[in-house]
């Protein structure tokens, strides 16, 4: 199935929402280590209260969930073999970029090389699924179908000669 430009852009937006919010969620949830309650149920409730009353956590969380909703809606019309690599691979790249912007250490030259290779791989995935590539593939399939039909005709002609 060929992917439209809108579908690819929606998947890139999902990756940006998922990956871009991860460093923000990590930073905003740093205060959870200070929450200590006697039972696991009280601990859970206090942690939820701490997180959801913190707007620094809540805003990235809601954006992240919007990414999940968009992903779910996009999957209805997008090939899964395209959606998963785009979203997951690019989310990692967006996480590294936003993390670097926030002052985190992302790993130097190897991380940058990994990002470049990931973008090249995703570009190949996208290129192989765009409509013009699909038309070329259909053209090739048409040639294979013609060859297949020719073989069938020759085979049926050979059989009729045997029985005729």
Swiss-Prot record:
Keyword terms of this UniProt record = Membrane, Transmembrane, Transmembrane helix
Do the record's keywords include Nucleus?
no
- Main location (coarse class): membrane
**Transmembrane portions of the chain:** 1-21, 82-102, 112-132
Q: Which Pfam families match?
A: TMEM234 (PF10639)
Indicate yes or no for the key word Transmembrane. yes
- Localization: Membrane
InterPro entries, sorted: TMEM234 (IPR018908)
- Listed as disulfide-bonded, the cysteine pairs are none
**According to its record, how does it sit in the membrane?**
Multi-pass membrane protein
Q: Name one GO cellular component term.
A: membrane
Family affiliation:
Belongs to the TMEM234 family.
Name-wise, this protein is Transmembrane protein 234
Q: What is the lineage of its organism?
A: Eukaryota, Metazoa, Chordata, Craniata, Vertebrata
Q: Which gene encodes it?
A: TMEM234
């Amino acid at each position: 199935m060929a992917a439209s430009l809108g579908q690819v852009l929606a998947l890139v937006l999902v990756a940006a929402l998922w990956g871009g919010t991860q460093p923000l969620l990590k930073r905003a949830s740093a205060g959870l280590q200070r929450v200590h309650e006697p039972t696991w149920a009280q601990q859970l409730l206090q942690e939820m209260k701490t997180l959801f009353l913190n707007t620094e956590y809540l805003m990235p969380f809601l954006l992240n969930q919007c990414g999940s909703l968009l992903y779910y809606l996009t999957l209805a019309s997008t090939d899964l073999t395209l959606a998963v690599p785009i979203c997951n691979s690019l989310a990692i790249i967006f996480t590294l970029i936003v993390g670097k912007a926030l002052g985190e250490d992302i790993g130097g030259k190897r991380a940058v090389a990994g990002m470049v290779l990931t973008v090249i791989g995703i570009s190949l995935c996208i290129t192989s699924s765009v409509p013009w590539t699909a038309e070329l593939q259909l053209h090739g399939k048409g040639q294979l179908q013609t060859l297949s039909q020719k073989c069938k005709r020759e085979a049926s002609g050979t059989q009729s000669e045997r029985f005729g």
